From Swiss-Prot:
Tree of life domain: Bacteria
Gene that specifies this protein: murB
Domain annotation FAD-binding PCMH-type: ranges: 40-204
Subcellular location: Cytoplasm
Alphabetical list of InterPro entries matching this protein: FAD-bd_PCMH (IPR016166), FAD-bd_PCMH-like_sf (IPR036318), FAD-bd_PCMH_sub1 (IPR016167), FAD-bd_PCMH_sub2 (IPR016169), MurB (IPR003170), MurB_C (IPR011601), MurB_C_sf (IPR036635), Oxid_FAD_bind_N (IPR006094)
Provenance organism: Fervidobacterium nodosum (strain ATCC 35602 / DSM 5306 / Rt17-B1)
Keyword Flavoprotein annotated: yes
Known role: Cell wall formation.
Single GO biological process annotation from the record: regulation of cell shape
Stated family: Belongs to the MurB family.
Entry protein name: UDP-N-acetylenolpyruvoylglucosamine reductase
Main location: cytoplasm
Coiled coil found in the keyword field: no
């Protein structure tokens, strides 16, 4: 006899068995805190990890067919889930991590960590990701938000993205992806799910690439609070000449806390979980910073992180 795991998601035993047959690892009533860098957030009724791209597509097809709401997660580095139980299924791309190198091109699955992608480039003496080394998150997440750092953006090296639109597998060229500052078509077209990405690099000297990557990591450790759970830079830059971290620091807010959430003492653009933080603490701190920046600079800040409700 079928039972309901959660009335709001209509997940029956039959659906669970079908997902299992698709090759998914399934975790019931799973804590999202175990899957996001912030180490906080509520439970979801089901957390599914397909073991292949085909299994992933079958999973999405089934959830769509059954009318079950879902979210996609990569490495969880840019997500802030609220504290309350969330009513949707979460599907992970983490095992969609295939890599294929063809001369100066690298095709990878959306779930591959960007750090591993950088190491693949290094191993194959390909230059272009030196400033991206240590970028947290998955390839899919980087493409989704056009992640960037130290003057580099994901869009620079993208050639093509393979996506699933809920019916068909489609290919999008660079000019069709709608890249902008921390955005892409995938943010507005929620039915489009990134499966693979192809990057174009150029041949370089392995030692030079390695040394530049080390320099990038050194800068990260010196300037970012990597020793604490966080979701990276919290706010988008509202305009090219407005540095959010500098503005927050000018307000004397470095080290300011609400509950377990704190504005980093190392970089004011980061909010960290200094221990026992709730999502509510982080959200209150975000609003506090927005208010203070608005009062002093007449600038409206937007969050770079994704807030899951």
């Amino acid at each position: 006899m079928d039972y309901m795991l959660n009335i709001s998601t209509n997940i029956t035993r039959k659906i669970l068995e079908t997902l299992w047959n698709y090759g998914c690892d399934l975790f019931l009533n799973e804590e999202l805190a175990d899957h996001v860098n912030f180490k906080l957030g509520g439970k979801v009724p089901l957390f599914a990890i397909p073991n292949s791209t085909n299994g992933f597509i079958e999973t999405i097809n089934l959830l769509n067919k059954e009318g079950i709401e879902f979210r996609i997660i990569g490495r969880g580095t840019n997500i802030l889930p609220v504290d309350e139980p969330l009513p949707y299924v979460v599907v992970s791309t983490e095992r969609m991590d295939d890599v294929f190198v063809d001369n100066e091109k690298i095709q990878v699955g959306a779930g591959l960590s960007f750090k591993k992608l950088c190491l693949v480039a290094l191993e194959n003496e390909l230059s272009g990701f030196e400033n991206a080394f240590g970028l947290p998150g998955s390839v899919g997440g980087a493409v989704y938000m056009n992640a960037g750092c130290y003057g580099w953006e994901t869009a620079e090296n993208i050639v093509e993205v393979v996506a699933f639109d809920g019916k068909d597998i489609i290919k999008l060229g660079k000019n069709e992806i709608g890249f902008g500052y921390r955005t892409s078509i995938f943010k507005s077209e929620k039915n489009l799910i990134i499966l693979q990405a192809t990057f174009k690099l150029k041949k370089g000297n392995k030692n030079e690439i390695y040394n530049l990557m080390l320099e990038t990591m050194k800068k990260r450790y010196e300037k970012q609070p990597l020793e604490f759970p966080s979701a990276g830079s919290v706010f988008k830059r509202p305009r090219p000449d407005f540095y959010v971290g500098t503005a927050i620091e000018s307000l004397g807010l470095k080290g300011f806390s609400i509950g377990g959430a704190q504005i980093s003492e190392k970089h004011a653009g980061f909010i960290i979980n200094k221990g026992g933080a709730k999502a509510e603490d982080v959200l209150k701190l975000i609003e506090y910073v927005k208010d203070k920046v608005r009062e002093k600079y007449n600038v409206e800040l937007e969050t770079e992180i994704e807030i899951w409700k």
